[in-house]
Design a protein with these regions (language model features):
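Divalent cation-coordinating acidic motifs and surrounding scaffolds
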Residues: 82, 94-95, 131-144, 157-160, ...
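Bacterial N-terminal signal peptides that target proteins for export
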Residues: 1-11
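Intrinsically disordered, low-complexity Pro/Gly/Ser/Thr-rich segments with frequent PxxP/GP/PP motifs
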Residues: 71-96
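A structural motif detector for short, solvent-exposed N-terminal "entry" segments of globular domains
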Residues: 25-66, 110-111, 196-235
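Composition-driven, intrinsically disordered low-complexity tracts enriched in small residues
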Residues: 784-812
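N-terminal signal peptide c-region/cleavage motif recognized by signal peptidases
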Residues: 20-22
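Extended non-catalytic accessory segments flanking core domains
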Residues: 132-137, 179-487, 491-501, 534, ...
Length: 812
């Protein structure tokens, strides 16, 4: 056993270059304080107990995360440290707090269970923590190393070397600060590292060579400032790029220069050719120069035309590597997007100012193809290469959007709109490739024609209209505000209520299947009663027999109907689908005109969120695009199919129409299970639906790293074989999925001006899901009849034409 331990230690020390300790002549530097403040205010204070000045360039700090034995952070110290003096290394957040007390900025990322080691010429001489160990509760028994800052008890370090894999005794070597954020006892060295002067005649390293250069070293760089983000809430820096005549092919010729807000460094503006010297490092997987110690020198102030934007076209050939059409090839450079690109997602537009752009609308792969099929995999890969984020050039949140000009609830930016002539700086930030606009350059043109807001298609008076509507946690606050899942205040709820009522009235359905309505009973103060009353005296809601509420969740499904157009037939029937899927409800109706029957069954299956899932179960995410809880949703579908086979409402002709948020895209296993049982999935049907263009929800274009984001329909209308021939058409009314989230009823994070500017008492962004609408001709010939196909086609064409003309005249 001893032999094994010695051999292990020998291998470890060899890996650090510890072949000889003879070069260690003085008392060693040591960690004197370990700083783990909140909000990333992290640092390490280093003390020189020796009687002579120490060259810090001989020392390196290494970090080993999460019990690993391979270093995750490593950087050399800079300058010198006089006898009995201290040197403070810290993150930029600590420098913002302490200013010049921080002698060297470094990307420290320890969390109390990560080891940090001080290394002298390859030999470990001090440490905090233990390499190869990740204690669940941190090191220490009296006070845990997690979430605390510490001061060293010892004041000398006689060790020639240490074993950083040996047990770590926090209790006897370190004392915890009373307040982890009290930095008053930190004192960096007053002896600053020597600053090498830089002038326009100084030699420099080509920017193109920096990608292969050693990081944590200083370099002199020359280039033209193409974009300057040193303004309020900007990115605290600027981009420099090599002039086109000196640029190198197939490699980036630009780099970001970071200058913290607390820095006194100044100089340079867009169009200047400058020279500067600083440390090469990486932040968020993007190279940058930081720690500038002198002002930026301008060598030529008329160089703006020497850097022209490079055309960046989608799709990329790859997202990595230096191919001629990979984003890495253009990183940091001034680019233009010559293609007219579609806004495929605006989910983060209100919060972060981000728009996802792509070649046409991107679709969820499993909305078009079965999970793990070659087609689904190919589409996911295509999606990854066909998108880019267009940002707003700011680093703060909840700004008023800048596109289009004078953005408001009436002047929105929908998914499906297009941007033309966009340009800016291509960069990698927040785990995504994006283009940052440049102040003073051309603003892109917003094209609204590809996907304008449209009125709902007019209903034929002889048809029955059934609609599915997810009402986004509609809760009237019967027991007060804030509600469990819905509005926080009465004012918010009033806004939500007006928008949803506006949408319901515009749709003009005869029956609605609702999802996400508060499960607070059926009395006069209930959410369902409150909503139904707002539609008028003709409207009623279905009350399950002998039930105070439907299932045990905070939200439920419900049915409301126009009593002058349809009347309930027999009693409603309930199916309990267990504690994961919401309880479902079935009610048969008879049309007042023609007396034909049909049955409406609203459903809301288990979400794709992985919250609460057992990671070892089949309900966990199988990385097939279907998310978590897929078997649970399939099981629910099987239960529903078996239940409906027994005709639970006991009518002569069931004509079942299932509607709702199935939390499953059109080609995922739950929906395919319906098809196997001879049900027809209407919205995706090529005859009566919208085929491959169907969607009711947009999600994950920017955030999904596997290409599974895009448009698709979680919301469905599914007919049994008997009802399908009576379906005239099925469509999603795109009032929600394409609209920015900041137009909804929520008031959080909005100024008073924004609250007024972003809100409209209309149907748009009344929810996050689009309503799905089904028109039924219960009295006519089956829609599958060829003659009916012609009639319905003419009717649809005329209806669409009238709708288009009305929108045209409104715009004019």
């Amino acid at each position: 056993m001893k032999t094994f331990q010695l051999r292990t230690l020998s291998v470890f020390l060899s890996a650090l270059g510890a072949f000889s300790y003879s070069s260690v002549a003085q008392a060693q530097l040591m960690f004197s304080q370990y700083v783990d403040g909140s909000s990333n205010k992290k640092g390490l204070e280093i003390y020189n107990p020796d009687g002579i000045t120490i060259n810090l360039a001989d020392y390196e700090i290494q970090q080993f995360n999460n019990g690993g034995t391979a270093k995750t952070v490593a950087f050399r110290l800079q300058g010198s440290l006089a006898s009995k003096q201290k040197f403070l290394v810290g993150r930029s957040e600590l420098q913002t707090e302490l200013g010049s007390k921080v002698n060297q900025v470094a990307a420290l990322s320890f969390n109390g269970d990560d080891a940090v080691v001080l290394v002298y010429k390859g030999t470990p001489v001090d440490r905090f923590g233990r390499i190869g160990e990740r204690p669940a509760a941190g090191w220490g028994t009296a006070v845990s190393s997690l979430g605390n800052s510490f001061k060293r008890i010892e004041t000398e370090n006689p060790a020639l070397s240490i074993d950083a894999t040996a047990a770590f005794d926090l209790d006897h070597s370190w004392s915890a600060w009373t307040n982890r954020n009290d930095f008053s006892n930190l004192s960096g060295s007053t002896t600053q590292p020597p600053v090498e002067t830089v002038s326009c005649s100084s030699s420099d390293t080509a920017i193109a060579d920096l990608a292969a250069a050693t990081q944590e070293q200083t370099y002199t760089v020359r280039g033209v400032i193409t974009a300057d983000y040193r303004y309020a809430n900007g990115f605290s820096g600027f981009y420099v790029q090599t002039p086109d005549t000196k640029a190198r092919a197939n490699v980036s010729n630009a780099i970001f220069v970071y200058i913290s807000n607390s820095s006194a460094v100044k100089g340079g503006q867009v169009g200047d050719e400058v020279i500067l010297r600083g440390r090469l490092t990486s932040y968020q997987n993007q190279l940058q120069i930081d720690q500038l110690q002198h002002d930026i020198q301008t060598c030529n102030s008329n160089m703006a035309n020497q850097v022209q934007p490079i055309s960046l076209e989608l799709p990329f050939a790859s997202l990595t590597g230096g191919s001629t059409n990979s984003p890495q090839r253009y990183q940091g450079m001034l680019v233009k997007l010559p293609q007219t690109l579609t806004v495929s997602e605006n989910y983060n537009y209100g919060r972060y100012g981000e728009l996802s752009l792509s070649l046409g609308r991107l679709y969820i792969p499993t909305n078009l193809y079965p999970a793990l099929s070659p087609e689904a995999k190919a589409l996911a890969q295509k999606n990854l290469l066909s998108k880019i984020i267009f940002d707003d050039g700011y680093n703060n949140q909840n700004r008023t959007p800048w596109l289009p000009s004078n953005f408001s609830a009436a002047n929105t930016l929908r998914s499906g709109y297009q941007l033309k002539n966009a340009e800016g700086i291509l960069e990698y930030r927040f785990n995504g490739w994006r283009v940052q606009p440049v102040l003073g350059r051309n603003q892109p043109e917003v094209l609204t024609q590809p996907n304008p807001r449209q009125s709902v298609l007019t209903k034929n008076a002889n048809h029955i209209r059934v609609a599915s509507f997810n009402v986004l946690n509609y809760d009237n606050g019967a027991t007060g505000f804030p509600t469990e899942r819905g509005a926080t205040t009465q004012a918010e709820f009033d806004k939500q209520h007006r928008k949803i009522v506006s949408a319901l009235k515009a749709i003009d359905a005869d029956v609605y299947g609702l999802m996400e309505i508060a499960n607070n009973g059926y009395g006069p103060d209930s959410a369902i009663a409150h909503l139904t009353k707002a539609l008028g005296s003709d409207w009623k809601y279905v009350v399950p027999e002998n039930l105070d509420r439907l299932g045990g969740d905070a939200i439920a499904v419900a049915i409301i109907y126009n009593s002058k157009r349809v009347k309930p037939l027999n009693k409603p029937v309930v199916l309990d689908l267990g504690d994961k899927n919401r309880t479902t409800l079935a009610q048969s109706f008879q049309a007042v005109r023609g007396n034909k029957t049909f049955t409406v069954i609203p459903n809301h299956l288990k979400s794709k969120s992985c919250s609460g899932v057992d990671a070892s179960s089949t309900d966990a995410d199988q990385k097939d695009g279907q998310g978590c809880w897929n078997p649970t949703r399939v099981k629910a579908v099987d239960q529903i199919v078996q239940w409906l086979a027994k005709n639970p409402t006991q009518v002569q002709k069931q004509n079942a129409l299932l509607v709702g948020d199935m939390n499953s895209y059109a080609k995922e296993e739950p929906i395919l299970s319906f098809e196997k049982a001879n049900y027809k999935v209407l919205l995706n049907d090529t005859k009566v639906g919208q085929g491959t263009q169907a969607y009711s929800y947009v999600f994950g274009v920017a955030s999904d790293a596997n290409g599974n984001g895009g448009a698709g329909n979680l919301d469905h209308a599914i007919a049994d074989a008997a009802l399908y021939p009576k379906v005239v058409r099925t469509f999603a009314w795109h009032i929600n999925a394409d609209e920015p989230t900041l137009l909804d009823y929520n008031e959080e994070y909005k100024t008073d001006e924004q609250k007024a500017l972003f809100y409209g008492e209309d149907a748009y962004r009344s929810s996050d899901h689009d309503p799905v609408i089904v028109d039924l001709d219960l009295n006519g010939k089956d829609s599958s009849h060829p003659d009916d196909d012609k009639k319905n086609g003419i009717f649809d064409f005329l209806s669409e034409l009238m709708n288009w003309l009305s929108q045209l005249f409104k715009r004019n």
